[in-house]
Amino acid sequence: MDIHEVCRWTSELNVLVVEDDEVLRESFQQLLSYLFAEVDTAVDGQDAFDQWVKKQHDIVFTDLNMPRLSGFRLIEKIHQQAPQQAMVVISAYEDEIFQQALTTQQVNYLIKPVSLEGLLNVLIPVCQSLPLEHQGY
């Protein structure tokens, strides 16, 4: 599958990027803006949850270690309200057991630094799991 096919899926979706590091947040937002209709950002888990409650983004990309509300707690809070919410963790932590634990929670995993290839490999199953009305067909 190439980037054009992925763009067909993503071009009408809105996403939320949660990252406390300003440089990483802005660079990831810029990358995603080529693929998605809307890319909102949050500086921490609490800011993200407040935004998500108002907008219910199609996909949430989140770091794990953040002030006020961690990425783990954010995932838990969102999944309490919307168990099928598409979530992607963005982390430099590469431990296989850790990644498997996230997978069992219906959370996808993207390793920092984020590459276009890695992003596309995660987006394909994430987009396929979205309800049909959100798949951009």
Q: Which sequence ranges carry the predicted segments?
A:
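Conserved sequence signature across two-component system core domains
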Residues: 18-19, 42, 60
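Active-site residues of response regulator receiver
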Residues: 63
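Non-catalytic signal-transmission and effector/linker regions of two-component phosphorelay proteins
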Residues: 1-14, 117-137
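Receiver (REC) domain active-site loop signature in two-component systems and cognate sites
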Residues: 66
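Acidic catalytic/metal-coordinating carboxylates
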Residues: 44-47, 70-73
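Two-component/phosphorelay signaling modules centered on CheY-like receiver
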Residues: 21-40
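Alpha4 helix (beta4-alpha4-beta5 surface) of REC/receiver domains from two-component response regulators
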Residues: 73, 94-111, 121
